[in-house]
Amino acid sequence: LHVVLGLRARYADPFILPIVIVLNGVGLAMIYRIDSDLKYPVGDSQLFWTGLSMLACAVVIYFLRDHRVLRKVTYISLALSLILLVLPLLPIIGQEINGARIWISIAGRTFQPGEVAKITLAIFFAGYLSTHRDLILVAGRRIGPIQLPRFRDLVPVFLAWLASIGVLVFQHDLGSSILFFGLFMAMLYLSTGKTSWLVTGGIGVVAGGFLAYHSISHVHDRIYAWV
């Protein structure tokens, strides 16, 4: 994968891939650690899907010569993301496992469509913010140190943010909700360079987490177990 990046994306950020590899490695180590306590070990399966994902990543990088073509599917990516996030809520194919309704079952096979939504949301955020960056930075009004964009310029991004909140409220998936919101804030910061957005987002995370902890039992149990 590193070789493919060097050949096809030599100007890509050199830190992202090593960080992802380290995080994935830590996850694999933790899974193998608890495998002995599970009736059906999943470490080897996770390792297989890791290898397959790396292969798919290499193929995409090799054949996607110009990443700017993804701007053409900005709104398609948003629509696809919303559809994927709604699928587990459907009564026929949606499945609730361990208190979280994030699975769909088709022909006896279970799958988390939210995993694909993470990719399509990243494509949407990148495409939309790169196109509307100047409007977000310049248009709107300033309140203290924070430059607020016009609401109409952030409507699509706001919809994506609502989708992440919906994941928490309706699917009881705290991890994915935090990841979606973190992705939203990271992309917004990279686009604008405004630290104030990170502060505002951090306040939103703390406030939302506090409310979820006291109002959603599944979230309370997850946080309690982690602490």
Question: Language-model segments: which ranges?
Answer:
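Hydrophobic alpha-helical transmembrane segments of multi-pass inner membrane proteins, especially
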Residues: 1-11, 15-227
